Amino acid sequence: MQPAAPPHPAELRRAALALLEQSDPQAKACGTRALFAARDCLSLDAAVVLRPSAPLPGRPQRPLLMPALRVPQRSLATVKGRAALLHAIAHIEFNAINLALDALWRFPGLPSAYYRDWLQVAAEEAHHFTLLREHLLGLGHDYGDFDAHDGLWTMTARTAHDPLARMALVPRTLEARGLDATPPLQRKLGSAGDARAVEILEIILRDEIGHVAIGNRWYRWLCHRGGLDPVALYPELAARYEAPRPRPPFNLSAREAAGFSAEELALLGA
């Protein structure tokens, strides 16, 4: 039985912050989806400068977090190995809920469409997490059973002061890596006989194209507002914030569908 979604404030950005502070993964996921369902009943105060009342992000005691290179790699030939891989993906999706909620509450003074876009992203990430957790439970495991790393939130913290840097380096960089990584993961899980995992990853890939497109749209909007060239600015931001360099193979069709220009796609191989 899923926990009931916690009550949330009637103002969208305050509600997003309250959910980001929530430490229970299932309550966070359920609450985020409930917030999206109630979106037409919520007010929006885009001007208010909010302050967290608890450390961010709220998260459970487990999984234990460690550097990515210390997270054990397991064979997909075993159920435990498949569960470990699915747990790693679930952890990414849990962090993605936090990333979207943070983009929603943190930055004042943006158009209402920006906040609505990131609410949709948060709800879809919550759906992905729920699908993966349900599949994990079917394999005899749960979220928190394996160790994980914290790379996604690290970049979120680095860009906490600047929505332009956030749009450039979280959705357009870190989340775009998922577009490249998903098809090989689908092939591996398909070879291991996990058809349900392949189906879930297909849902995730479809939605993530839209999420990266939202990041592209608001990155370009913020560049236009500041009179900046989005293509020329990106490598400067990537170097300044020490963003990871994209690694091949690239899913060029998905990246194109997500709004990367031909010039940007050509630069991937430069």
Task: Locate the predicted segments by residue.
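Non-heme di-metal
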Residues: 1-270
